[in-house]
Amino acid sequence: MNGFLLVALGGAIGASLRHGVGLVAVRHLPLGWPWGTSFVNIAGSLAMGLLAGWLALKAEGASQEARLFLATGVLGGFTTFSAFSLEVATMLRSGETLKAGLYAGVSVLLGVSALFIGLWMARRIFA
């Protein structure tokens, strides 16, 4: 199957999931913090760690198509670092410097930590 089509199909799934998370966050969590974006960035990092670990440990022969669909498509559509950047910039432009710094720092720290936890989990599950 064409790589662009696989990425597009996966991206549609990931973006739809991201939209759903955003709707749930807006309806059920306190306003004033980008909960949906925070969640998808951290969960997406965890999922990428698990996927990378699985591909390295158990799916050496995984097709390029599977990698394109899952990593570039689904997870690329799900995670939202471009939205994250916009939200940080918006906070900074609004004079919310402390909030922007806290949001950026916590998101990056937890995202990278979640990726390492995902890799660790993959070694425990798939090795």
UniProtKB/Swiss-Prot annotation:
Molecular function (Gene Ontology), one example: metal ion binding
Record bears the keyword Oxidoreductase: no
UniProt key word Oxidoreductase: no
Record's bilayer topology term: Multi-pass membrane protein
Catalytic activity: fluoride(in) = fluoride(out)
Compartment annotation: Cell inner membrane
GO CC list: plasma membrane
InterPro entries in the cross-refs: FluC
Any Pfam family the entry gives: CRCB
Transmembrane stretches, start-end: 37-57, 68-88, 102-122
Binding site for Na(+): 76, 79
Origin superkingdom: Bacteria
Notes on how activity is controlled: Na(+) is not transported, but it plays an essential structural role and its presence is essential for fluoride channel function.
One example of a Gene Ontology biological process annotation: cellular detoxification of fluoride
UniProt entry keywords in alphabetical sequence: Cell inner membrane, Cell membrane, Ion channel, Ion transport, Membrane, Metal-binding, Sodium, Transmembrane, Transmembrane helix, Transport
Family: Belongs to the fluoride channel Fluc/FEX (TC 1.A.43) family.
Main function: Fluoride-specific ion channel. Important for reducing fluoride concentration in the cell, thus reducing its toxicity.
Name under which the protein is recorded: Fluoride-specific ion channel FluC
Organism expressing this protein natively: Hyphomonas neptunium (strain ATCC 15444)
Lineage, uppermost ranks: Bacteria, Pseudomonadati, Pseudomonadota, Alphaproteobacteria, Hyphomonadales
Gene transcribed to yield this protein: fluC
